[in-house]
């Protein structure tokens, strides 16, 4: 069956997040667009889980049966997303993806593109929120709603200093997880999860190849410590790909030749052969024509350097048109031997 959908909807993705008013929600999407399928995170664990399952069923029915965009209710916002495309539709109604990105959660970084409050989080609020989140997760597991091979993504602040780290790691024991980390602190339990679960991984948004640019983007002068901790995680891996890196391109800030070539050298040391090329999503839907030219030009340069070093990349946050333009420009850069 072919119908308009996206990968996250088909996985019944459970994204613990915050809306624009900073209210906790569970959504089937993590795009920064209005009217995405979501529920408010209010009530008991039983009530919240019922609301989520019911929302998934309504979204599933709409994807299967509604072709006219003007008649959409639960996926009304999805039509503005580049990921919402005609595709073979298959949904077993189990949760195959859990993304824990709810706040307040502590993080040592001061990334210039991050909109999360830089102040210390309200511990009382954080405790109450994560008590409820863990109750929902434990109930979903107990009721068999989460697929055994589900992918867990932990991206709330920094897991190594999270107040609920121990309880989260207990849930994740023996499960496939990707830990979004700033690598400022090495975590033995995360390293053990990598060793025990070949499908687990860590992801660092490295965003720089030099100490100077790292300091500019992240707010800390500790790039050597970051690369040291990356190497320590690498020692605990059992297959290629368990160390994954992302590069958020910000034209005029971190798009120099030295940064791009240096990050490739770091990838070689860690046996990383793939890089996610990303963007500052705050202005994803409000960029000027010149902004788009600058972004795709920088992405093309990085893409070309990766290709020349037999490395691959993805550009999930770029539209199909932007990706096409990046590849065309990269091929031209390579053909003209500009790198």
Positions of PLM-derived features:
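Core AdoMet radical
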Residues: 94-106, 115-132, 146-162, 172-187, ...
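N-terminal pre-core extensions flanking Radical SAM catalytic domains
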Residues: 1-123, 290-339
């Amino acid at each position: 069956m072919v119908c308009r959908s996206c990968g996250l909807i088909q996985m019944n993705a459970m994204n613990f997040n915050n809306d624009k008013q900073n209210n906790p929600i569970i959504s089937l999407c993590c795009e920064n667009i209005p009217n995405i399928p979501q529920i408010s995170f209010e009530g008991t664990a039983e009530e919240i889980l019922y609301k989520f399952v019911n929302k998934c069923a309504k979204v599933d029915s709409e994807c299967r049966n509604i072709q006219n965009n003007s008649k959409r209710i639960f996926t009304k916002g999805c039509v503005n997303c580049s990921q919402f495309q005609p595709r073979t539709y298959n949904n077993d109604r189990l949760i195959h993806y859990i993304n824990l990105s709810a706040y307040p959660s502590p993080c040592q970084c001061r990334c210039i593109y991050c909109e999360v409050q830089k102040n210390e989080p309200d511990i009382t609020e954080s405790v109450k929120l994560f008590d409820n989140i863990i109750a929902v997760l434990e109930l979903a597991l107990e009721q068999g709603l989460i697929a055994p091979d589900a992918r867990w993504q932990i991206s709330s602040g920094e897991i190594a200093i999270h107040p609920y780290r121990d309880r989260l790691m207990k849930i994740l024991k023996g499960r496939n997880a990707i830990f979004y980390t700033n690598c400022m602190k090495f975590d033995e339990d995360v390293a053990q999860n990598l060793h025990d679960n070949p499908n687990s991984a860590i992801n660092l948004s490295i965003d720089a190849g030099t100490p100077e640019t790292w300091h500019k983007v992240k707010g800390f002068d500790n790039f050597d410590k970051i690369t040291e901790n990356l190497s320590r995680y690498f020692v605990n891996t059992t297959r290629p790909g368990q160390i994954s890196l992302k590069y958020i391109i910000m034209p005029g800030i971190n798009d120099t030749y030295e940064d791009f070539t240096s990050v490739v050298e770091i990838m070689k040391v860690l046996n990383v052969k793939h890089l996610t090329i990303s963007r500052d999503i705050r202005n994803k839907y409000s960029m000027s024509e010149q902004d788009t030219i600058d972004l795709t030009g920088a992405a093309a340069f990085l893409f070309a350097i990766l290709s020349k070093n037999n490395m691959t990349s993805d550009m999930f946050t770029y539209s199909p048109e932007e990706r096409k333009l990046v590849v065309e420009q990269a091929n031209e850069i390579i053909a003209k031997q500009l790198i």
